[in-house]
Design a protein with these regions (language model features):
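Short glycine/serine/threonine-rich phosphate/pyrophosphate-binding segments
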Residues: 14-24, 46-47, 89-93, 113-121, ...
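Short glycine-rich or small-residue beta-strand-to-loop segments that form or flank ligand, phosphate
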Residues: 4-14, 73-79, 105-111, 137, ...
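C-terminal non-catalytic interaction/assembly regions of soluble proteins
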Residues: 256-408
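N-terminal phosphate-binding or glycine-rich loops at protein starts, especially the Walker A/P-loop
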Residues: 1-52
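Accessory alpha-helical/coil subdomains and C-terminal extensions
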Residues: 36, 98, 106-111, 117-129, ...
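Glycine-rich oxoanion-binding loops at beta->alpha junctions
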Residues: 49-105, 114, 153-155, 167
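Short, ordered loop/turn segments at secondary-structure junctions
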Residues: 10-12, 39-45, 79-80, 112-113, ...
Length: 408
């Protein structure tokens, strides 16, 4: 069996994915691994032999602490889809040739649904050829849609940013004595966890989002307009949070109603965008109200300055837990978070077979959603509040947060 470890990051980044990388690296060193390699741009980089020695890059004092609070993917990312089993055998042979060349015994991949698909295919291929390399997935996605885990590292920080931004937009939207609607577009294709985080803004000091539109509930433009109109009779200035993935009962994305060209990625996912602009235009045309469209876009996944310290810590710990599992002989699994209690918030870790996770999605339970009023019920708030708890204290340099940059 190989003596070295290799780790990669894949898919969309988060502001805590590097904390998981730090956890993997730290635990590997604790287990006595001499060389910990990093794949530049995920498995796609491995195929191009773009591999770096993290032992040299991260062993200096202070590097891991800085890495934990650096947003985006330190190693770079990819959206490379491995071929199905039995197809393009040469791709798998090239990957395992590279792993043998670096004497790899432990393979860790930090990512979401598509990244777990990679762990599934590589661990299955390893079993097929009799390889003893251990493949373990480390969860990551702001979308919070991985199954068999209470929540996904990255979600808590994104939710904290969204809740914070909604509070600030509510304050901004009320400064003029006129009717206005600010439509805020938030990421989320099939699962509305991110958009639901707008509900966290409501408190004694903030009205919060007046409406929250989620992809779990079919979108009816007429019902939407009627609800906006009714609410404006009570409160002239509204903030509406809408998922980029909201779709009609006919399964048509609302952003497509604006006649935007539709493109797809390597995994067949439609590129979304323009939902807020379409809805703000619809409101302006039908209700003659001032409107503004705001797209949070990539800000919601890289705002490390307002990250949740709970999220940062859990991300590090789940990376370390994945390494511990590999050294216990586990392979073809994903490390997952298991909530023990809400108050006080206690969360531990467990393993799940990758076949039960890859290519599946977890959506918000429908009984947590008030579809008629475009609101979230208390169970969601009890679920999400602990995940945004505690504040980070990043290192600053010349008045701005300092990050760890990989020299190419």
């Amino acid at each position: 069996m190989g003596i070295n470890a290799i780790v990669g990051q894949s898919g969309g980044p988060t502001c805590v994915i590097n904390s998981s990388l730090a956890g993997v690296f730290s635990a590997c060193r604790r287990h006595g691994v001499q060389k910990v390699f990093g794949m530049r741009h995920g498995v796609q980089g491995l195929l191009k032999d773009e591999v770096i020695d993290l032992t040299e890059a991260l062993d200096a004092p202070g590097k891991l602490s800085l890495l934990r609070h650096t947003p985006a993917s330190y190693l770079g990312s990819c959206r490379y889809k491995l071929p199905e089993s039995g197809q393009m055998e040469a791709v798998y042979q090239a990957i395992f040739d590279a792993l043998r060349r670096y004497d790899i015994g432990y393979f860790f991949y930090i990512g979401g649904n598509d990244s777990m698909d990679t762990i599934l295919k590589l661990s299955d291929y390893a079993a097929k050829i009799g390889s003893d390399i251990r493949f373990v997935g480390v969860p990551k996605t702001i979308d919070n849609d991985l199954t068999h885990t209470d929540h996904t590292p990255g979600y808590g920080s994104a939710a904290k940013y969204i809740g914070t931004t909604i509070k600030e937009l509510v304050r901004d939207s009320t400064i003029y004595d006129l009717k206005s609607v600010t439509v805020v577009e938030i990421m989320g294709r099939n699962a509305g966890w991110l958009t639901a985080a707008a509900a966290l803004a409501e408190d004694e000091d903030c009205e919060g989002a007046a409406m929250i539109c989620l992809p779990e509930v079919p979108f009816d433009p007429e019902h939407f307009i009627a609800r906006v109109d009714a609410l404006q009779q009570q409160t002239p200035s509204l903030v509406v949070a809408v998922s980029e993935g909201v779709r009609t009962a006919e399964e048509r994305y609302v952003c497509e109603l604006a006649h935007n060209p539709v493109n797809v990625d390597a995994f067949g996912h439609t590129y979304l965008g323009g939902t807020a602009h379409y809805l703000s235009g619809l409101i302006a045309a039908r209700l003659h109200s001032k409107t503004r469209a705001v797209e949070l876009s990539t800000l919601q996944r890289c705002a490390a300055h307002v990250a949740s310290e709970t999220d940062v810590s859990e991300s590090f710990d789940v990376g370390a837990f994945a390494v511990d599992a590999a050294f216990e002989g586990k392979t073809g699994v994903m490390a997952a978070l298991k909530r023990v209690s809400d108050e006080p918030y206690v969360c531990g870790f467990e393993l799940h077979d990758i076949h039960d996770i890859a290519n599946l999605e977890k959506t918000i339970p429908l009984d947590w959603i008030d579809a008629e009023r475009y609101r979230l019920h208390e169970p969601f708030l009890a679920y999400a509040r602990p995940l945004i708890a505690q504040e980070v204290k990043p290192e600053y340099q010349k008045g701005l947060p300092r990050h760890l940059k990989l020299n190419r």
